Amino acid sequence: MLTTAACGLGALLVLVRSVSARRAAKEKIQRARTRRTESLHRAEQVVLRYRQSHPSTDSALILSLSLSELTKRLQEDSLSPEEVFYSYMEKTLNVHKELNCCTEILLESFEQLKTISSKKEGLLYGVPISIKDNIAYKDHDCTCGVVVNLEQPAQGDSVIVKVLKKQGAIPFVKTNLPQALLSYDCSNPIYGQTLNPHNPQKTSGGSSGGEGALIGGGGSILGIGSDIGGSIRIPASFCGICGFKPTAATGPMAKDVDSLALCMQALLCDHMFSLDPTVPPVPFNVQLYQSSKPLRIGYLESDGYSQPTPSMARSIREVKALLEQAGHTLVPYQPLRVNKIMTEFIFRGIFADGAISMIQKLKGGPVDPCLQNQVNLYTIPTWLKRIISFLLKPFSPRFPVILDAVSGVKSIPDLWKQHAAVEVLYADYISETIAHWRRCNIDVVLCPMIGPAFNFNYCGQISTVISYTALYNLLNFPAGVVPVSTVTADDEEELKHFKGIFQDRMDKLLKKAVTGAEGLPVAVQCVALPWQDEVCLRFMKEVEHLVKQKRK
């Protein structure tokens, strides 16, 4: 009797705690949404007052200027920081209503604007800049779309925000991202799903998807994202803008390559080097970026692990032809052992603990639909994962290997063994890849970029396609994307016959994910060797220029 009563009481306590935790999470989410609504409302009121007192401000002209043109006019005083700021703030508010891309307006930006004219300095003087939600801004949450991170405001600005402010920029809005940043979709239980600026039935991509949508929709001229597996490049591709992952993981997103280069020039300054000694104290090499020397370019249509969609492959062929016509040399290139690298380094490396750390982070609140399929997979008992993996091996080459990789290691000694083995293999792989580049005698690589934009709820089911982006995070190579085309009716027709390399579930899902994309942007990816960021950007600029010339 006593034992039964004790068990019943224990079960009741667990239930009460669970209900209480869910209620607390719900209340936290509601408070966060209220803060966002209030910040948007206050910004709308200030913009309205400015509009009433400055009816002659030509916002259409301001929004049409490139970053280089805008900074020139700000420096010359032919435009004021106020005119630029309020034009972009108003546009951001309108874009957000359509795409749900912002997590909070940084109301401190109004105060910064008041003092900016007294200190007219910096390469980005008077430029309003958007920043991804996970970038620290004093007194604001870095939620990462996770409930447990709510109401824990940053104690100070991140280094990148400090440098941007020093260069005269005005961070004015934080943008949306997927829950826990472990998806290339853009939805979380706090702020919801961000939509694609070209088609609201498609995702903006992620994890810097709020940035992609806001810039693609015209609400920001320059944004800062982060990229640990393609998180700048994928939303840039999906939203039809340019994005750059430097040798380091945090980088700019904008509508053109010159804007990316100007931002990198602004960031690689003495202030950055003094605040963050881990950044090599090497200023941006403008001469290297502006070089017109013909390049020797390696190119690939497929990495042999994930079959590119028809529009991805076509874009590579078209850009290759343009580059050859412009006098560059194109040679076939194939990355080394992508299949093994994806399994051993990417999946097994990220999920060495069997995804326990990530699941713990999610326990404080609801799981977003864009992450639910992944979480379902991770929470399958390890013994069952291994059985399923064994049974599926004859029928599906990739999924069983991924399932086995995300099962994690069996013990702490095994973790150390894996860590030691990966360290050696990782160093060897980088050396081998660089040696492979040298043998091919290439300066840069042109490769496919994931796209076009996916239909909702597919990103979390297709992990294989990130081979095109995550490989360069692993190698620590600078990589960027440039929009070069749009999906054609012929691409859609060819997609009907798409089988993929392995003809497995992942290939079938990829086909479904990109169906119905006619007219959506398609990009290519440009890659260079470590710390040759200027070379990568110069290559991107060349691609951009040739594509624009062709359109004329």
Where does each model-flagged region fall?
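Amidase signature
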Residues: 1-121, 266-474, 484-518, 531-535, ...
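Short, well-ordered beta-strand elements within core beta-sheets of diverse protein domains
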Residues: 69-76, 130, 148-152, 249-255, ...
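Conserved hydrophobic/aromatic pocket- or pore-lining residues that grip, position, or stack substrates
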Residues: 88, 126, 132, 164, ...
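ATP-grasp fold ATP-binding core
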Residues: 119-138, 171-174, 191, 446-447
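Enzymes and membrane/adaptor proteins characterized by extended Gly/Ser/Thr/Asp/Glu-rich
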Residues: 123-163
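Short glycine-rich, flexible loops that bind phosphorylated cofactors or substrates
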Residues: 139, 179-180, 306, 454
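Peri-catalytic substrate-binding/gating loops that frame the active-site cleft of hydrolases
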Residues: 145-155, 243-244, 298, 310
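Short glycine/serine-rich loop segments
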Residues: 157-267, 475-483, 523
